[in-house]
Amino acid sequence: MRRAAMYEEGPPPSYESVVSAAPVAAALGSPFDAPLDPPFVPPRYLRPTGGRNSIRYSELAPLFDTTRVYLVDNKSTDVASLNYQNDHSNFLTTVIQNNDYSPGEASTQTINLDDRSHWGGDLKTILHTNMPNVNEFMFTNKFKARVMVSRLPTKDNQVELKYEWVEFTLPEGNYSETMTIDLMNNAIVEHYLKVGRQNGVLESDIGVKFDTRNFRLGFDPVTGLVMPGVYTNEAFHPDIILLPGCGVDFTHSRLSNLLGIRKRQPFQEGFRITYDDLEGGNIPALLDVDAYQASLKDDTEQGGGGAGGSNSSGSGAEENSNAAAAAMQPVEDMNDHAIRGDTFATRAEEKRAEAEAAAEAAAPAAQPEVEKPQKKPVIKPLTEDSKKRSYNLISNDSTFTQYRSWYLAYNYGDPQTGIRSWTLLCTPDVTCGSEQVYWSLPDMMQDPVTFRSTRQISNFPVVGAELLPVHSKSFYNDQAVYSQLIRQFTSLTHVFNRFPENQILARPPAPTITTVSENVPALTDHGTLPLRNSIGGVQRVTITDARRRTCPYVYKALGIVSPRVLSSRTF
């Protein structure tokens, strides 16, 4: 039995001194100073990543290699017995493929991974959805607006206006950005036809409109009017137009993402835009072109015609003189076009200069024409359209309408206190803001330390996350407005343009950059996840959205798990 080395009392010696003194003590033969052997380390700890990699299936010998586990959502053997009440986002599937087990028999089988090792699985998933961009499930088919619902006279010859918050619902479908805006406007008009028109509300009182134009183009700062007389029919960015007392509410709707209008603090509760918020965004009025052109007409048209007659006779005499000069041209051709030695001018050029000098000398003798007083043009705003719909001017002497535009308030209003201070103009997202989805494999993967084990679908531990495979696809169409006009006559989409005579209530133009929503299959590598050492023959796969709900729009869900040894089990 070897005794431990003995040292004198005091602090222990350093490691270097002990190692260097050991060979000397052994040479002297001291029984108490025997050489120190290195500590014994088991081979298992020398190779922590070796471990055991045996995989044992029921009734089969252990397999000393890795395998793969396939998670399929629509296996025919699982539908009738396991998934009759499930869907593609929450299903059960059998994972033992080496025997012809029925689903009932497979549920009693297990795949045992060597419990002397830590196991992990490389998880790869394939997810395909068929979700439309406007649907009730993702809160993209509804929005609220405050509109006028009653305009009734009172006993004292006044008008009582009544406003209410109304929820509008769009039909579900996969629409482009332009079509969605048309459907939102159509929902407001249909509510007016059903409620407002029956209670005395005028067509010019429709106080909520979604548009895409920049109503300030053509604005003259001197006159305060849009001088072309029409608003530029070009799409720039989705816009919200409101009349006094009106507003829109996107608190429980994601359609604001489609309009490209977001909050600067997106996690704050509520998203409501009212008329008072759009300070500085009043739409300028149009120039009354008919009145302007009528004021420029000259009443003395006949006098102008007489002057034109004298000009005509004068031109005839000039033609005769030109004909005589042309007859003499063959005779004087050489003389008139020859360059003299004392000047570079030809004889013809000198004659022309002499004629101009004579005309200038004779000009003072002519009687000066009497200048007629010019009429001052009439510049005034257009108050109504051809169908007598009012443009709602602020006052009779104002050049602005009561309509307020979010786009104008954002770009031309006060950036410190206006709508720009708490809203943000961003790129329109036709998907209305695609969310994330979570993968849960509660019977196969070990629960992460951030989750507790539960059997509720909404609280399953999350082992993987990815974005919902719905993307916004954009393409450029330079003839978008032309196509919109053609479709109005071929597809009879004039229902979206009920008030073509009114420049504000007219159908908004289609943007040249068209965006559509597209479902693209996604292949995601979730990395290596810790596996349980005992895997049941039937596994549950759950895919939940951001609100931890199963998603009915999942069309295909596949998962491939490749088990492998991570390390030896040390505890």
Curated annotation (Swiss-Prot):
<dbReference type="InterPro" id="IPR002605">
    <property type="entry name" value="Adeno_Penton_B"/>
</dbReference>
<keyword id="KW-1164">Virus endocytosis by host</keyword>
<feature type="region of interest" description="Disordered">
    <location>
        <begin position="347"/>
        <end position="383"/>
    </location>
</feature>
<comment type="function">
    <text>Major capsid protein that self-associates to form penton base pentamers, each in the shape of a pentagon, situated at the 12 vertices of the pseudo T=25 capsid. Involved in virus secondary attachment to host cell after initial attachment by the fiber protein. Binds host integrin heterodimer ITGAV-ITGB5 (alphaV-beta5) thereby triggering clathrin-mediated endocytosis of virions. Mediates initial virus attachment to CXADR-negative cells. Binding to integrins ITGAV-ITGB5 also seems to induce macropinocytosis uptake of the virus.</text>
</comment>
<dbReference type="GO" id="GO:0019028">
    <property type="term" value="C:viral capsid"/>
</dbReference>
<feature type="compositionally biased region" description="Low complexity">
    <location>
        <begin position="356"/>
        <end position="368"/>
    </location>
</feature>
<keyword id="KW-0945">Host-virus interaction</keyword>
<keyword id="KW-0946">Virion</keyword>
<dbReference type="GO" id="GO:0042025">
    <property type="term" value="C:host cell nucleus"/>
</dbReference>
<keyword id="KW-1160">Virus entry into host cell</keyword>
<comment type="subunit">
    <text>Interacts (via the cell attachment site RGD) with host heterodimer ITGAV-ITGB5; this interaction promotes virus internalization. Interacts with host WWP1 and WWP2. Interacts with the fiber protein (via N-terminal tail region). Interacts with the capsid vertex protein; this interaction binds the penton base to neighboring peripentonal hexons.</text>
</comment>
<dbReference type="GO" id="GO:0019062">
    <property type="term" value="P:virion attachment to host cell"/>
</dbReference>
<feature type="region of interest" description="Disordered">
    <location>
        <begin position="297"/>
        <end position="325"/>
    </location>
</feature>
<keyword id="KW-0426">Late protein</keyword>
<keyword id="KW-1148">T=25 icosahedral capsid protein</keyword>
<feature type="compositionally biased region" description="Gly residues">
    <location>
        <begin position="302"/>
        <end position="311"/>
    </location>
</feature>
<dbReference type="GO" id="GO:0005198">
    <property type="term" value="F:structural molecule activity"/>
</dbReference>
<feature type="short sequence motif" description="Cell attachment site">
    <location>
        <begin position="340"/>
        <end position="342"/>
    </location>
</feature>
<keyword id="KW-1048">Host nucleus</keyword>
<keyword id="KW-0167">Capsid protein</keyword>
<keyword id="KW-1162">Viral penetration into host cytoplasm</keyword>
<comment type="similarity">
    <text>Belongs to the adenoviridae penton family.</text>
</comment>
<dbReference type="GO" id="GO:0039623">
    <property type="term" value="C:T=25 icosahedral viral capsid"/>
</dbReference>
<feature type="compositionally biased region" description="Low complexity">
    <location>
        <begin position="312"/>
        <end position="325"/>
    </location>
</feature>
<keyword id="KW-1161">Viral attachment to host cell</keyword>
<dbReference type="Pfam" id="PF01686">
    <property type="entry name" value="Adeno_Penton_B"/>
</dbReference>
<protein>
    <recommendedName>
        <fullName>Penton protein</fullName>
    </recommendedName>
</protein>
<dbReference type="GO" id="GO:0075512">
    <property type="term" value="P:clathrin-dependent endocytosis of virus by host cell"/>
</dbReference>
<keyword id="KW-1165">Clathrin-mediated endocytosis of virus by host</keyword>
